[in-house]
Amino acid sequence: MKYGIIKVKRAFLYEENGVDVVDEVFFGWSVMWEDEGEWIEVWTHYGYRGWMERNLIEEKSREWMEEREKAGNTYVVTRGFADVMRGARVQSRMLETLGRGCFVEKMEETENGYCRVKLANGISGFVPEVALRKRLDSDRFLWGKSEERFFVEQGIPEGWSEEKFRRKVVECAKGYLGCQYRWGGKAADGIDCSGVVFMVYLMNGVLIWRDADIREGYPMKAIWREGEEMCLVEERAKAGDLLFWRGHVGMYLGDGRYLHCTGHERVFGCRVNSLRRGDEDFREDLAEATPTRRSHSMIFTAARA
């Protein structure tokens, strides 16, 4: 097995035919693969598969990957966009622009509210410290011994509490409001329904399945069954839980409201809607396509109890 990191700002994963987009990865994200070629099938650090161009990956040894994990100086861009500057001042030359979700190596040098970072392509420059957060998720799936159980047994981030986690994921999700819809996307300039909830959970240290369904082996469980009344959602769901329809997913915010990214022709983006019939922003079409599952994010906690 070979290992590497993405060395461009963004790269799309495709179906084997190289035409249909299935996912998006960013600077510094880890992948592994077996067979070489112009196009290769990769496994991501969150267990998803897809095909991408080999020249977008910087090959690394497994030892390098493990050492990066242990070092703990990988940070993630939390702002929609963040410029990498040659110097630690706003007037300096811009070297690169990073999007939310990009991983960088944070160096010790800091100045004027900036910190020096190193990118996966070797570029080094300064980024505002407020645009970064210490990475909380893990690459260990790529070399783990228990692949089937890794995601339900992934470690709890330091200082974790259910109340804090729920508050953080809701706050993070709202950062995508107004973002346009893009099939397979996970970026602040284009994202799909499952991309939003995946990124929100990743930014807060939990890796979930990337698509709009509940996949065995990942930290989600159903707390609502098909055929039950919609009114039961508010009784059982808490802020930060995920709401699943067939082929669609959103995040419950509380008070009968949910955030989702939709390709519907009248919206085509990320917005908030109501579950309550009679509200101005109630989605009749989603009400008719009754959600098949209600997913309780906190199985992540139960799995560690």
Show where each model-derived region lies.
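Active-site nucleophilic cysteine motif
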Residues: A173, G185-N204, I208-D211
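Boundary regions of SH3-family modules and the immediately adjacent low-complexity/disordered segments
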Residues: M1-I5, R10-F12, V19-G37, W43-T78, ...
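Glycine-rich catalytic cores of cysteine/serine-nucleophile enzymes that process amide/ester linkages
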Residues: V25-F26, A82, R86-R89, R93-T97, ...
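Short, flexible active-site loops
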Residues: E153-G155, K174-G185
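Charged, glycine/proline-rich intrinsically disordered loops and linkers
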Residues: F141-I156, W160, M220-M230, E280, ...
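N-terminal non-globular leader segments, chiefly Sec-dependent signal peptides
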Residues: M1-V8, W183, I214-R225, F282-A305
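Loop/turn positions that initiate beta-strands
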Residues: G28, L98-V104, A237-G240
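...with weaker cross-activation on analogous glycine-rich loops/strands in unrelated enzymes
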Residues: V206-R276
